[in-house]
Curated annotation (Swiss-Prot):
Residues 140-172 are annotated as: Disordered. One of its GO terms (cellular component) is mitochondrion. One of its GO terms (biological process) is regulation of transcription by RNA polymerase II. Monomer and homo- or heterodimer. Interacts with MIP. Forms high affinity heterodimers with members of the CNC-bZIP family such as NFE2L1/NRF1. Residues 79-93 are annotated as: Leucine-zipper. Residues 145-172 have a biased composition (Pro residues). Pfam families: bZIP_Maf. This is Transcription factor MafF. Since they lack a putative transactivation domain, the small Mafs behave as transcriptional repressors when they dimerize among themselves. However, they seem to serve as transcriptional activators by dimerizing with other (usually larger) basic-zipper proteins, such as NFE2L1/NRF1, and recruiting them to specific DNA-binding sites. Interacts with the upstream promoter region of the oxytocin receptor gene. May be a transcriptional enhancer in the up-regulation of the oxytocin receptor gene at parturition. Belongs to the bZIP family. Maf subfamily. It comes from Bos taurus (Bovine). GO terms for molecular function: DNA-binding transcription activator activity, RNA polymerase II-specific; DNA-binding transcription factor activity, RNA polymerase II-specific; RNA polymerase II cis-regulatory region sequence-specific DNA binding. Residues 51-76 are annotated as: Basic motif.
Amino acid sequence: MSVDPLSSKALKIKRELSENTPHLSDEALMGLSVRELNRHLRGLSAEEVTRLKQRRRTLKNRGYAASCRVKRVCQKEELQKQKSELEREVDKLARENAAMRLELDALRGKCEALQGFARSVAAARGPAALVAPASVITIVKSAPSPGPGPAPGPGPASGPGPAPGPAPAACS
């Protein structure tokens, strides 16, 4: 097998060019501005210029991809944190809702008991005192006022006829 003298000469020239090219580290290559890079590339072959520019572009893209991965991980962590907070809030609201439903059921039971009592009182007084189902019970508590006027007594005087005051209503 014989070696072609022309190809050997071309290989020797190529090696010399590679040896004469300034060696730039990856960090230095990425850190150069375009103007500085072009200054470093003067006098190099088009092939060497293309290779260095491609290497620089590859390194920069690698950096951009890494920063995107970091950003995506940070966003994912933030979204997980928000999700956990929202889940805790939903649980809290569900507990509050359940407690309010229990309270509402208890109040409905009391209302129905009061209506039953009002009906029994009205039935004992006669048909004229029957309670209309659409009436509303209003309970007002007030502190006795120390001013002039009649002092609050033990309640209305018992006499003939229906008792004054609001009538009970249907609970819904």
